[in-house]
């Protein structure tokens, strides 16, 4: 469909909770396709509608071998007490990385493009990406959850040791 322009990190849409999708129609299908096209053009792992200036609870995550995960009005149903601290970043904040502690396992309820309710259990990296993107749709950047922001030198070392 179309590669959309990303809003800058200072855009007010990124600080507000996105609106729930109420109508499951062709405009939602176009939005999901635009998110996919833009995500791949930006070489990102995930993207949500507010990042392309649409205040809707719609996101897409590239789960690599498992394919694309489309999230519409996602809600966390439960999450494990067991956590993992790992590096996070965002295309909205290029060159900014932080260590964020998140649940190791989550159960999320969402809807598919046709309005059917789906529930999925996600672990580790996928759980982290879902939690990150839901935060983003709720106006919470990963930097607010970060235990600490890393220096350029620390980020370099992190990728070398990974």
From Swiss-Prot:
Protein name according to UniProt: Peptide deformylase-like
PANTHER family: PEPTIDE DEFORMYLASE
Disulfide bridge positions per record: none
UniProt-listed InterPro entries: Peptide_deformylase (IPR023635), Peptide_deformylase_sf (IPR036821)
Domain of life: Bacteria
GO molecular function, one term: peptide deformylase activity
UniProt-listed NCBIfam families: pept_deformyl, PRK14595.1
Family: Belongs to the polypeptide deformylase family.
GO terms, biological process: co-translational protein modification; translation
Organism for this UniProt entry: Staphylococcus aureus (strain Mu50 / ATCC 700699)
């Amino acid at each position: 469909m179309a590669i959309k322009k990303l809003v800058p990190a200072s855009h007010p849409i990124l600080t507000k909770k996105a609106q729930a999708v109420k109508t499951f129609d062709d405009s939602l299908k176009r939005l999901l396709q635009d998110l996919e096209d833009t995500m791949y053009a930006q070489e990102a792992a995930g993207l949500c509608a507010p990042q392309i200036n649409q205040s809707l609870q719609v996101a897409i995550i590239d789960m690599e071998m498992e394919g694309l995960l489309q999230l519409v009005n996602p809600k966390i149903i439960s999450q494990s007490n067991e956590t993992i601290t790992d590096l996070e970043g965002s295309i909205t904040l290029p060159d900014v990385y932080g260590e964020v502690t998140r649940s190791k396992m989550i159960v999320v309820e969402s809807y598919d493009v046709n309005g059917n309710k789906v529930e999925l259990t996600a672990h580790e990296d996928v759980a982290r990406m879902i939690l990150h993107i839901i935060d983003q749709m709720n106006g919470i950047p990963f930097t607010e959850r970060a235990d600490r922001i890393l220096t350029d030198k620390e980020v370099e070392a992190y990728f070398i040791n990974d």
